Amino acid sequence: MTDLKKAAQRAIELMDLTTLNDDDTDQKVIDLCHKAKTPAGNTAAICIYPRFIPIARKTLDEIGAEDIQIATVTNFPHGNDDIAIAVLETRAAVAYGADEVDVVFPYRALMEGNETVGFELVKACKEACGEVLLKVIIESGVLADPALIRRASELSIDAGADFIKTSTGKVPVNATLEAAEIMLTVISEKNTQVGFKPAGGVRDAAQAAEFLGVAERILGADWVSPRTFRFGASSLLNSLLHTLELADAPKPTQGY
């Protein structure tokens, strides 16, 4: 197997296959569940809006893919600074049956100099999660400044995040190698049990390999696993399957 094919295979096993569109329906989520059970093995998770968790759970059970985790989003996509609402949404997501919650850090508040609300919001949402995995989206493409990307990562980890994630996929700049370098460095300094999720903008096996390479350089080859590394993506899967010669070439897309 070539290095590119190895990267494609790994990326599928590390993927949160995502649909977070305004026009999502039960049928689209059912289709997503079927896609997540790929000819190259199952993706790590699917990521969907909370209201679709019950139909996703039912579908995954029906197709014998119970090992695929169900992730959802809260305080999404704008990262508002109302802690009470973020906590209510997170509790509701857990009640719906989410295995993982991706919450948006109040990044605009941080840009305005308020570090406290981000820390407190993540801490409160982690408490609301209990045993459910908490990923914190810092929206690195909007933060832009390396010092802010670093600070959002530090605050999230200090507040109890299980993962730090680059992006919502709803802004012009999503996952970049520069942001990955900063965020993974913070993980190496703070707590190597914390995971990393580049989301949006990873289009093919070659790009996936670049992100995996940064993680391995900073944290070691043994660090990368579904417990510590995920790709948030929708259009990436078809490209990876094409690399593995298991699907036709993907059509050009503007998607996540």
From Swiss-Prot:
The active site is at D102, K165, K197. It comes from the Bacteria. This is Deoxyribose-phosphate aldolase. It catalyses: 2-deoxy-D-ribose 5-phosphate = D-glyceraldehyde 3-phosphate + acetaldehyde. The keyword Lyase applies. The gene is deoC. InterPro entries: Aldolase_TIM (IPR013785), DeoC (IPR011343), DeoC/FbaB/LacD_aldolase (IPR002915), DeoC_typeII (IPR023649). It comes from Shewanella sp. (strain W3-18-1). GO terms for biological process: 2-deoxyribose 1-phosphate catabolic process; carbohydrate catabolic process; deoxyribonucleotide catabolic process. Belongs to the DeoC/FbaB aldolase family. DeoC type 2 subfamily.
